[in-house]
From Swiss-Prot:
Sequence similarity: Belongs to the RRF family.
Domain of life from the UniProt record: Bacteria
Family annotation (InterPro entries): Ribosome_recyc_fac, Ribosome_recyc_fac_dom, RRF_sf
Functional note: Responsible for the release of ribosomes from messenger RNA at the termination of protein biosynthesis. May increase the efficiency of translation by recycling ribosomes from one round of translation to another.
Location of this chain's protein in the cell: Cytoplasm
Name this polypeptide is given: Ribosome-recycling factor
BP GO terms, sorted: translational termination
């Protein structure tokens, strides 16, 4: 194993951390309807708890409305209750075998809460990135102790680790700014 291998492995881990962050912020409400809003909703179905996507189809009806097509008519009430109880501030209304979820406009206070939540997720993501950088540096130092790489390679590896961290932290900051803009948009 050399510095390049360690660097590539760490870069893959950092990319996964960014993907996880993107997935987390996708479920934060903005003023618009997106199917990701209901990703975390769990429904009590058939004696177990399952994700909403396993009991129905979620789609966007218009900019302020989601439409959930429940596959089993007996699950409509449980699905409606799960959406209401998910603490997302949504108003589901059953219509036959489907549920119309109207997305009310966000209050200024609620927008600020969502911005804080976005920043918290961003900070958690940065901590994860820093941990991957630390692991990369430890692996490089271990290789140097085993005489598998030279001191120059170690220094280059540490610089690579710092460069990777800065690149991915910049990406997190850009994603945070973009999400904040979406949230604060009226």
């Amino acid at each position: 194993m050399n510095v390049k291998d360690v660097s590539q492995k760490s870069e893959q881990k950092m990319k996964k951390a960014i993907e996880a962050f993107q997935h987390e912020i996708a479920s934060i409400r903005t003023g618009k309807a997106t199917t990701a809003l209901l990703d975390r909703v769990k429904v009590e179905a058939y004696g177990q708890t399952m994700p909403l996507r396993q009991v129905g189809n979620v789609g966007v009806s218009d900019i302020h409305t989601l439409l959930v097509q429940v596959w089993d008519k007996s699950m409509v009430a449980a699905t409606e209750k799960a959406i209401r109880d998910a603490n997302l501030g949504l108003n589901p209304a059953a219509e036959g075998q489907s549920i119309r979820v109207s997305i009310p406009p966000l209050t200024e206070e609620r927008r600020k809460e969502f911005v804080k939540l976005t920043r918290k997720f961003g900070e958690d993501s940065k901590v994860s990135l820093r941990n991957h950088r630390r692991d990369m540096i430890q692996e490089i130092e271990k290789l140097e102790k085993e005489k598998a790489i030279s001191e120059d390679d170690r220094n280059r590896g540490k610089k690579d680790a710092d460069d990777l961290l800065h690149r991915f932290e910049k990406q997190v900051n850009e994603l945070i700014a973009q999400k904040e803009k979406e949230i604060m948009e009226v």
